[in-house]
Amino acid sequence: MAAMYLPGLRLSRHGLRPWCWSPCRSIQTLHVLSGDMSQLPAGVRDFVARSAHLCQPEGIHICDGTEAENTAILALLEEQGLIRKLPKYKNCWLARTDPKDVARVESKTVIVTPSQRDTVPLLAGGARGQLGNWMSPDEFQRAVDERFPGCMQGRIMYVLPFSMGPVGSPLSRIGVQLTDSAYVVASMRIMTRLGTPVLQALGDGDFIKCLHSVGQPLTGHGDPVGQWPCNPEKTLIGHVPDQREIVSFGSGYGGNSLLGKKCFALRIASRLARDEGWLAEHMLILGITNPAGKKRYVAAAFPSACGKTNLAMMRPALPGWKVECVGDDIAWMRFDSEGQLRAINPENGFFGVAPGTSAATNPNAMATIQSNTLFTNVAETSDGGVYWEGIDQPLPPGVTITSWLGKPWKPGDKEPCAHPNSRFCVPARQCPIMDPAWEAPEGVPIDAIIFGGRRPKGVPLVYEAFNWRHGVFVGSAMRSESTAAAEHKGKTIMHDPFAMRPFFGYNFGRYLEHWLSMEGQKGARLPRIFHVNWFRRDEAGRFLWPGFGENARVLDWICRRLEGEDSAQETPIGLVPKEGALDLSGLSAVDTSQLFSIPKDFWEQEVRDIRGYLTEQVNQDLPKEVLAELEALEGRVQKM
């Protein structure tokens, strides 16, 4: 009898125990409601059959990705009371989740490897790890055995073949997700290229196996109408990079259930990238064209809810400049045969944070979400529209608001009307400024990489790294105010290296080594690295920089630096614009002395904090080159 660990896999060389020892049901005994099992590639067919044996769904639906199928899925969700039509817009819908299922759950998200050190660095004595959670194969096996047998009883298992990146691109990868959530089906159809063409492209090739269940088997008459299915007490999101697998249980929320997103496109892909010599990063990609017609592409890494989407869809305040969007969240990058770093956006949609999005902050996002959008946990207006904090739209007379909790709400109420991590899920093609090359199979050429975060004090508006190695250190030292996208509470300054802290698929020390190794790639033309901070405040707590469309002024300076312009001056932390080098024409008074000040006492403390963090969290796995950069920074700050 063949043993298996996860569905479709044999017992591995590491001795991992199987999920079940029972033989799989034959294809003939599976109740297939839509699609043809016999037409699936053998590997996919085996994965589906074994998973069905484990989870025991009522039936199987193989998704073809068609418009007719999508219409039927949305109708089913509406019938179940899980989504409501928003008649103010064309084909827009609102979902409200269980209040316990509203964000990524980092504490229940694990990487499974035989050796703990493959996943996380060895910590300095007694420290609590912040760079990922490891679970042993045996413990993971027990967790799976506890959760998955029979977990889909009474539900449909949907088979979702999907491509991360344009179908057929050499930079793309294929996954197959099995889920018992129709909400996931509707969302994945937006966020990925999904359906029959993906299976045709896959053939007998390799794919990432993704298994998801809301963790609520139906043994009676189904869910009560409108009850969001989830199992928060048993939630677990597991990644098995050696086997290229993802397993998720108990949550229907996007980051936990749309397995192509953070789970595949960052955690698993970062491990693929290390093994294959490329980069999978939490970065937006944008094209920027100056008034003379010169176009450049940049990638930028900010922690969640720090303005990636706003920057990726920016409407430049500088006359004659144009920004076009390739992607707002994830970049897969590889050097081509000419040594040029090229990037694709592996996603097909935007899964954006709604609160704070308005015609003033992101007019292109507002234009994008007027149709074919699935909103989650935003407020609803009585005239069939949506509402959230910062939407900046006056309500017509007599129009009332229902909060994300389904309760009456009015401006001035203590609780927010929309959850801080409420989302819009919308096809990328609807964005009015999508770059013409956003689906180019070869990717777009990246000339600069930008790191950034929310730093209310001490960190200047923009600075350039001295070189690649220094830039890698700058990425490793990133810190930012915490965001709503995870379950952390309150505003604390958190270390978030490369904006990847929750998304590393392997040991962060080895991730740093991988970034450093790019310097040794034959013929590689390394992008310049910059750091930005739109969020510095004055003593009264007011922002020193207007941000949003005015951020084009910083991109202008970056582009001029890429052209070789001598417009930077050296400081202990990097190269900042010379006085007058930043185009501030037409702006009301900006206090550049505060905006670019580098207080010695702040940076002495910053160095101590960075050293403490890297020593504690990365410890013996910290590359000597990164430690040398830290010591060099410390020496420069001491001489200020």
Curated annotation (Swiss-Prot):
Q: Does the keyword Manganese apply?
A: yes
Q: Which domain of life is it from?
A: Eukaryota
Tell me a GO biological process for this protein. cellular response to glucose stimulus
Phosphoserine sites (modified residues): S115, S304
What this protein needs as a cofactor is: Mn(2+)
The record's note on what follows loss of this gene reads: Homozygous deficient mice are viable with no overt phenotype. However fasting plasma glucose are elevated from regular chow-fed deficient mice, indicative of defective glucose homeostasis. Deficient mice present abnormal nerve conduction studies and peripheral nerve pathology.
Gene Ontology, cellular component aspect: mitochondrial matrix; mitochondrion
- Leading EC class: lyase
Query: Which of UniProt's keywords are assigned here?
Result: Acetylation, Decarboxylase, Gluconeogenesis, GTP-binding, Lyase, Manganese, Metal-binding, Mitochondrion, Nucleotide-binding, Phosphoprotein, Transit peptide
Known InterPro entries for this protein?
A: PEP_carboxykin_GTP_CS, PEP_carboxykinase_C, PEP_carboxykinase_GTP, PEP_carboxykinase_GTP_C, PEP_carboxykinase_GTP_N, PEP_carboxykinase_N
Describe, as the record does, how this protein assembles with itself and its partners.
Monomer.
Give the UniProt family note.
Belongs to the phosphoenolpyruvate carboxykinase [GTP] family.
What does the protein in this record do?
A: Mitochondrial phosphoenolpyruvate carboxykinase that catalyzes the conversion of oxaloacetate (OAA) to phosphoenolpyruvate (PEP), the rate-limiting step in the metabolic pathway that produces glucose from lactate and other precursors derived from the citric acid cycle. Can play an active role in glyceroneogenesis and gluconeogenesis.
> Which HAMAP family does its entry note?
PEPCK_GTP
Record's NCBIfam families? Answer: PRK04210.1
State the name under which the record lists this protein: Phosphoenolpyruvate carboxykinase [GTP], mitochondrial
Q: Which organism is it from?
A: Mus musculus (Mouse)
